[in-house]
């Protein structure tokens, strides 16, 4: 972010540098001169003279053929492009913060799923222990129930480590210390429930929302202006030069009207030979314009690809969530039925174990799908340059 801000400041300074060429350059000169001429170079005797002088001098290039004007336009486009770059950086930063937050909430929700399933598995373990103590089942059922429970609890430390990692990541992205935001984020929270279809408008409108596309277009405009300025350098340059001041032998006479001097000197400068410098400068500007056009085309293609991928990914993730919710609901029903049949001695304990493992897997998949859907939504936000209009 700081680098993008610095580039904006540099582009603004370059713009003002070019704009300054619209104005005359004015200088102040003052001095004292003592001059002695040789008596052996002419028939005139050797003389010594001295005088004081003070004057204002001016030099002004008249932008007849638009060289300065085109260079100012190029810097205006570059300045605007630097602001688009800053916008792009802020969009990316917002997307990174949102993604880290979603990943954090996803892990926290997975942790809740694990704890909830652990509690359910502990209840099943108690049931098997009661049935074992009454001689209704073998000790194998107890051992298998413990195995499933301990395996579920074993994932808790890894989830807690991931949660801590994302809290630290968020702190860095926000420019804060982890301990400053940990109390807020450790309290837990659910994933936002958003599954609405999104209308993004026409493709052309879509592309114009992206800062990188707008920036690439501005860069093309800047290079086109520089090519025009390079061609204008082939034409004559017109200058208006002049000076106004005072000169006198005695300092006390310096400001008298008879001491006034001035000079007005319009001039024309036209380079007719430069060893190929002008030709190659134009070729360079043309090559840089072609490069900017190619970069613009590539940026547009990348924008279309990223947006299409994000949109399709989001739409498919919604379908996956709907399907996984049905699977999860059936998993809950399966565990309930298998446990009831087991209690009645009508079904082996293996069916209960399979139902427990499946339900844990289904609920984790559902949480992960919800997190993935939100990440696809964030990717779509980024691909559209920071949002969309319905």
PLM features per residue range, with description:
Residues 2-3, 19-20, 62-90, 140, ...:
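Sec/SRP-type N-terminal targeting helices
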Residues 30-57, 180-199, 228, 241-281, ...:
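Small/polar, glycine/serine/threonine/aspartate-rich low-complexity segments that form flexible
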Residues 134-137, 302, 347:
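Structural signature of alpha-solenoid helical repeat scaffolds
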Residues 122-126, 150-179, 230, 317, ...:
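Short segments within alpha-helical structural elements
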Residues 1-14, 191-221, 271-272, 300, ...:
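Bacterial Sec-pathway N-terminal export signals of envelope proteins
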């Amino acid at each position: 972010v700081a680098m993008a801000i610095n580039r904006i400041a540099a582009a603004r300074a370059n713009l003002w540098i070019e704009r300054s060429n619209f104005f005359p350059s004015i200088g102040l000169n003052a001095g004292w001169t003592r001059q002695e001429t040789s008596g052996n170079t002419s028939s005139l005797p050797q003389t010594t003279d001295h005088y004081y002088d003070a004057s204002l001098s001016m030099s002004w290039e008249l932008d007849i053929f638009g060289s300065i004007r085109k260079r100012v336009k190029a810097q205006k486009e570059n300045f605007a492009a630097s602001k688009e770059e800053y916008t792009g950086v802020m969009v990316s930063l917002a997307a990174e913060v949102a993604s880290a937050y979603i990943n954090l909430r996803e892990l926290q929700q997975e942790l809740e799923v694990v704890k909830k399933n652990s509690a359910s598995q502990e209840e099943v373990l108690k049931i098997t222990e009661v049935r074992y103590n009454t001689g209704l089942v073998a000790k194998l059922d107890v051992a298998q129930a413990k195995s499933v429970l301990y395996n579920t609890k074993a994932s808790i430390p890894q989830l807690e480590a991931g949660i801590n990692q994302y809290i630290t990541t968020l702190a860095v992205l926000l420019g804060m210390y982890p301990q400053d935001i940990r109390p807020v984020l450790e309290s837990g929270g659910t994933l936002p429930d958003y599954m609405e279809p999104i209308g993004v408008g026409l493709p052309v409108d879509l592309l114009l929302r992206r800062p990188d596309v707008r920036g690439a277009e501005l860069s093309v405009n800047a290079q086109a202006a520089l090519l025009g300025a390079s061609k204008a350098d082939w034409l004559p340059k017109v200058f208006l030069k002049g000076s106004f001041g005072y000169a006198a032998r005695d300092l006390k006479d310096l400001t008298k009207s008879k001491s006034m001097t001035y000079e007005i000197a319009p001039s024309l400068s036209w380079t007719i030979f430069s060893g190929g410098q002008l030709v190659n400068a134009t070729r360079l500007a043309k090559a840089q314009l072609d490069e900017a056009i190619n970069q613009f085309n590539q940026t547009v293609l990348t924008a279309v690809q990223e947006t299409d991928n994000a949109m399709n990914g989001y739409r498919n993730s919604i379908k996956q969530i709907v399907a996984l919710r049905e699977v999860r609901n059936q998993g809950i029903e399966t565990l309930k039925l298998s446990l009831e049949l087991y209690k009645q001695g009508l079904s082996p304990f293996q069916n209960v174990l399979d139902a427990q493992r499946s339900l844990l897997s289904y609920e984790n998949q559902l949480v992960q799908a919800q997190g993935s859907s939100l990440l696809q939504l964030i990717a779509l936000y980024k691909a559209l340059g920071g949002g969309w209009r319905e």
